[in-house]
Amino acid sequence: MSVVGIVPAAGAGERLGADVPKAFAVLGGRPMVEWSLDVLREVCDRVVVAVPPDRVQPPDFVAGGATRSESVRNALAAAPEASIVVVHDAARPLVTVELARRCLDALEDSYDGVIAAIPVTDTVKEVEHGDVVGTPDRGRLWAAQTPQVFRADALRSAAGEATDDASLVEKMGGRVRVIEGMRENFKITTPLDARVAEMLLAD
């Protein structure tokens, strides 16, 4: 069984305001993506990173796509040996080896995937054209994180575009399990997020 990590790291990250692609913005004295690579290399046999064209370094740094889903597909195509895939966002540098291992350990025979997620604590509103049209039951809502672990064949069979890979596996009828993630494993999107992450990484 070959476990391959995939890191989509081709996004520009305009909201972060950096002058380099977000995954390569300096965080805690090193490119942001390196924090995640350290973790994935502890639990995977190989890690493939989907990067902007000017950062391609075969075989493990491959060209990303115009979308996150396309970047994941490109990275997966570069790892035909994969039987299990661990997808992780470069913008979640506070992930831990323990969380990644829990995701892998939870992939039982009856599941196609396992994702880290956290229960939603705020009340969520459905809004159309500025009007509230519904209030979902908060008790059933979880905010998806990464790592997301899949049987490679299930992910290869999934098609389309989505903001997370589990959505694509779900659409093809795959069974996806949730394990509780970490509040600290937030996604860095804004300069404020980066400042908070810097403080946590310094602890």
Map each language-model feature to its residues.
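Short beta-strand segments
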Residues: 6-10, 50, 87-88, 117-119, ...
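Short phosphate-binding loop-to-helix
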Residues: 57-85
